[in-house]
Amino acid sequence: MFPQNNLPGLLLLLLIAPTTPGAASGAAAAEPADLWRREHRLIDLHQHVGCTTQHLARAVRIMDAVGLGLVVNLSGGFVTPARDGGPSEFERNQTLADTLHPGRFLHYLSLDYSGWDDPGFSERAVQQIETGHRLGAAGLKEYKRLGLFLRDKAGNLIRPDDPKLDPVWKRCGELGLPVSIHVADPKAFWLPYNERNERWKELKDHQSWWFGDTNKFPPWKDLLESLNRVIERHPKTTFVCVHFANNAEELEWVDAALDRHPNMMADLAARIPEIGRHDPRQVERLFLKHQDRILFGTDFQVYHRLILGSSGNEPPPTDADAELFFAKHWRWLETRDRDWEHMTPIQGDWTISSIGLPPSVLRKIYFDNARKLLVRSLPPPTLRARRISQDLPLGQPVRNNLWELAEPVRIEQRAADGEVNPALTTSVRALWSERYLYLALEAPFTRLTVFEPAQANAERVALDRPGASLWDRDVVEAFIGSETGAPGRYIELEVAPTNERLDVRVDLPRKDFAWSSGFESTSLVDRKHKVWSCQMRVPLQSLAANPPRPGAVWRLNLFRCDRANRAFLAWRPTLSGSFHEPARFGWLEFLP
């Protein structure tokens, strides 16, 4: 479980935000964002974490302090076998992270270019992609080595658009693996290498980052054009162009590139200092226009020292420095503060101005866009049922009640593909006693679609008449499986706004509609506030031969059908046209 508060990060945000009209204007955005951080909903799509016990522990400690629930470690490593024949670098890294900190990290693989000049490289590279997918890699990370460092045996640079790599990009698209790709670097890295260069602090400590030698390196714009050709040739592959589309200095170029390439996205990693020096109104317009294509990322790194977007020979940052680094990201995105010192001073001696995005856009950048992008790879979610000492009557308000002790989860993603629908976000809480499992759902609506009159004495099932069964109107559903060794065996419960209900014992492909669990429910429709609430009380003896013990974990998925909006939502998307995909269930944990 995550810590129940996030006081250090919140205090930092308060400490660095001045009491100005601009700061006050960000209050509306900060309130929901603070809640998201307390609930650890944010996803950082761009970090590099050394997979050692110490580095992972430090990374998670900082994640907890600043409100990150999930980090994408782009440095997952190669999937090619180790020299001694043992597990690959990727397997070792993923196993350690999943063992020590389950559910906190996803890992991208990197391509091993060994044997580039040998026959069959493309086929072997595709095999690496397929192996990574089988092992659970969430995507492919490609570094700026393409076009700048990697060379063939003749000494020629290997460009991003080399035809030998086309099968790799294509296979990533076929497998649903996004490609996070870095080409080029800031323009200043091509300008004269001297103290007049505005990035001199960085370059003098990293001479290998200077690419101004035209005998060794291509022009800056040539690399961007090379990547553009790749994106155009592979429209079914999603390319996350890191560091704000690899061109944070030219907003018009980024805008045009996103317009031109629907399969292109951009992360923010290590480029807010550059984006933030632009006119904040221009930046805000760009973010509003492309709000579905921008992803939160920081380039935060945890190795023998912390790296806050970039670094040089300065003293190693502390954990407190890391918290301030993240707090400045929140400040830039959530307030309208002007002319303040950015989060990575080594990247330039200038100030930045905040863009104060509305909550509806912030949530997309902070986590919704990443949830859709990574929908196939995200770890299964967990609904934690709080234990109560005595049974609870149904119909009591969720607020100011035992229900408030239960941490909510949300049904808000389209079951088929993970698209998020915040307007219909349905919260779910769980409690359990010695005899019952309790579920409470709260569902906003625009217009209810129900069978009238309600059928009180019999379940509404008409398999021979399409459109005449309970699930053909508005319902909420819970699929609960107590047998971890029998994934196709579970109980299906449905409740409509009219409080019509249905229970089914499922043993795929069979469904027993005559079976009865004896579960009870209440349904309350608040037409003034457009919310309908449902509570269920399910006898545990109907769900399992033996009652759960504290700490037990069952399988669970939750769904909602909203016919007026043609919305078929899931807690964990099934990625198919059916809700009955037990491989896509999450978890129900019975807390002590």
Predicted regions, residues:
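Acidic-and-aromatic substrate-binding clefts and catalytic sites of carbohydrate-active enzymes
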Residues: Q47-L56, G77-F90, S114-E123, L150, ...
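H/E-rich (His + Asp/Glu) clusters that bind or coordinate divalent metals
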Residues: T53, N215, K221-R229, T238-L378
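Active-site gating/metal-coordination segments in enzymes
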Residues: A30-A33, P87-F211, N215, P262-M265, ...
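Structural preference for beta-rich elements and adjacent junctions enriched in aromatics
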Residues: P379-P592
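Bacterial N-terminal signal peptides
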Residues: P8-G22
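Alpha-helical scaffolding within the catalytic cores
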Residues: E31, Q54-A59, A82-L96, E123-Q128, ...
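Hydrophobic faces of well-ordered beta-strands that scaffold small-molecule active sites
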Residues: I43-Q47, L70-L74, F105-L109, L140-E142, ...
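An N-terminally biased module of ancient metal coordination in phosphate/nucleic-acid-related enzymes
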Residues: S25-G103, P381
